[in-house]
């Protein structure tokens, strides 16, 4: 499955516990078909407490984002509406992403 969502896109979560949430894509993992969305799918991770060189202790319970499957998000177009993503070849022969609903370019 090709991942049409890229880093920097604004997406809407359409399924799961964070349904309806909007956020910016921090990272995309095409081999796993997952994306990391800012402020979505926050989990608590328990990390071992360790001492740094200066004597400060780091660790404990850390809250961070976890990847979400790409099928659970939709890209938002320039109007802020969810849309499917398509491709078109422009005049220069470059492949550009377009919003299927409006036909506008999705320049990110």
UniProtKB/Swiss-Prot annotation:
Keywords: Ribonucleoprotein, Ribosomal protein, RNA-binding, rRNA-binding
Summary of subunit composition and partner proteins: Part of the 50S ribosomal subunit.
GO CC, any one term: ribosome
Known function: One of two assembly initiator proteins, it binds directly to the 5'-end of the 23S rRNA, where it nucleates assembly of the 50S subunit. One of the proteins that surrounds the polypeptide exit tunnel on the outside of the subunit.
Highest taxon of source: Bacteria
InterPro entries, per database record: KOW, Rib_uL2_dom2, Ribosomal_uL24, Ribosomal_uL24_CS, Ribosomal_uL24_KOW, Translation_prot_SH3-like_sf
GO molecular function, one term: rRNA binding
Pfam families per UniProt: KOW, ribosomal_L24
Family indicated by similarity: Belongs to the universal ribosomal protein uL24 family.
Name listed for the protein in its UniProt record: Large ribosomal subunit protein uL24
PANTHER family: MITOCHONDRIAL RIBOSOMAL PROTEIN L24 (PTHR12903)
Any GO BP annotation: translation
């Amino acid at each position: 499955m090709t991942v049409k969502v890229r880093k920097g896109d604004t997406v809407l979560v359409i399924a799961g516990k964070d349904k309806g949430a909007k956020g910016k894509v921090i990272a995309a993992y095409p081999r796993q078909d997952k994306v990391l969305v800012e402020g979505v799918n926050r989990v608590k991770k328990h990390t071992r407490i360790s001492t740094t060189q200066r004597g400060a202790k780091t660790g404990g319970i850390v809250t961070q984002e976890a990847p979400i499957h790409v099928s659970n998000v939709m890209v938002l177009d320039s109007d802020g509406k969810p849309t499917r993503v398509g491709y078109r070849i422009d005049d220069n022969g470059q492949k550009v992403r377009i919003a299927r609903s409006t036909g506008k370019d999705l320049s990110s």
